[in-house]
Amino acid sequence: LSRAPEFITLSDAAARAVAGAQSRHAALIEDAFDVLVETPGGGVSLTGDSKGRAQAKKAVQAIAERADQGLDIGEADVRVAIGNARSGAAGPLSANGGALPVGLRG
């Protein structure tokens, strides 16, 4: 399988959101998809097998979309993006535009 890096061009705000404080968000993505996430400037570089890169790319794009809307990205947002990428869910991190769905307990 190809382990060549794939570069995704992102805004500075989106790249910072994907990396997270102390690279915490990047580490979550790396662990979830067995890829290497690097932020050399101007975007994100993903290195790993093709399936891992494809899923990580979906998560990165979902996080970047929210960051570009001016929304703060927290660890919960990253975990939701990872879950959606794994399950093949498309679109924003949740149907109502929030980070997490609201349960019956509100």
Locate each region found by the language model.
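Short glycine-/aliphatic-rich beta-strand segments at the starts of folded cytosolic domains
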Residues: 1-17
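A generic structural signal for short, non-catalytic loop/turn and secondary-structure boundary residues
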Residues: 1-3, 30, 95
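Conserved residues at beta->alpha junctions
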Residues: 9, 20, 50
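Short amphipathic alpha-helix segments
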Residues: 13-31
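Short, intrinsically disordered, mixed-charge
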Residues: 24, 31-34, 61-65
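Compact, well-ordered interaction domains used in eukaryotic information-processing assemblies
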Residues: 27, 33-36, 40-42
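Dynamic helix-loop-helix/coil hinge segments at AAA+ ATPase domain boundaries and subdomain interfaces
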Residues: 99-106
